[in-house]
């Protein structure tokens, strides 16, 4: 793992990973949440995001003319990669066509037939990435790859994106497990973050708060 990639992972673990009860865009719930925008919109985080995405793109020899994704999770990633590269343009995909002005859904770079990479911040169901891929192809772009910053590895997100992107590949820079593991390393050993997602107390079944020396809830942790 490159130095920039490790630093980006550490920043995600510190600034973007949260424990608690959260409702996901998929409609489900989770005991953790990853808000990548607190990292991708951070000054240092933006630099690292651009560098690490660009490293991955160059390693795969996609040679895109532009990079884009569905607003708004993709927005800071698009800008970061474009600025870092100095040669790759950016475009944003609206969730719906404008009802005034030009009425277009693709904003920014608009060269039909161009090689493009679709990006997103977090992939859960993959719906936003799929929307962007479909809109890009409908416009006339040649999608050569799809990427996300963090993949949650649930809700059939990867299969959905892979089907939509095919024959182009789908690449995630990190998994939620990677970020959670790094979060553990950066926190005290008795932090709730030590636990696997959904861990419960061995005595009463409530959400556990420690696994040292045993998995227990707040009431039974002593």
Language model regions located:
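Active-site-facing substrate-recognition patch
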Residues: 1-60
């Amino acid at each position: 793992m490159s130095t920039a990639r490790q630093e980006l992972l550490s920043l995600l673990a510190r600034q973007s990973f949260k424990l608690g009860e959260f409702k996901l865009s998929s409609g489900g719930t989770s005991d953790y949440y990853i808000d990548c925008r607190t990292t991708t919109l951070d000054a240092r985080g933006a630099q690292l995001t651009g560098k690490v995405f660009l490293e991955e793109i160059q390693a795969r020899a996609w040679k895109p003319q532009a990079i884009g994704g569905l607003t708004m999770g993709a927005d800071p990633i698009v800008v970061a990669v474009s600025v870092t590269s100095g040669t790759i343009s950016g475009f944003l995909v609206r969730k719906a066509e404008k009802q005034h002005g030009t009425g277009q859904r693709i904003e920014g770079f608009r060269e039909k037939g161009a090689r493009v990479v679709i990006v997103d911040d977090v992939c859960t169901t993959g719906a936003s990435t799929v929307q962007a891929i479909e809109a890009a192809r409908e416009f006339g772009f040649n999608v050569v790859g799809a990427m996300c910053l963090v993949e949650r590895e649930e809700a059939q997100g990867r299969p959905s994106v892979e089907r939509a992107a095919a024959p182009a590949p789908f690449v995630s820079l990190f998994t939620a497990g990677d970020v959670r593991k790094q979060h553990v390393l950066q926190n005290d050993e008795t932090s709730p973050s030590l636990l696997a997602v959904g861990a419960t107390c061995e005595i009463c079944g409530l959400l556990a708060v420690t696994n040292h020396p045993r998995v227990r809830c707040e009431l039974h942790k002593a």
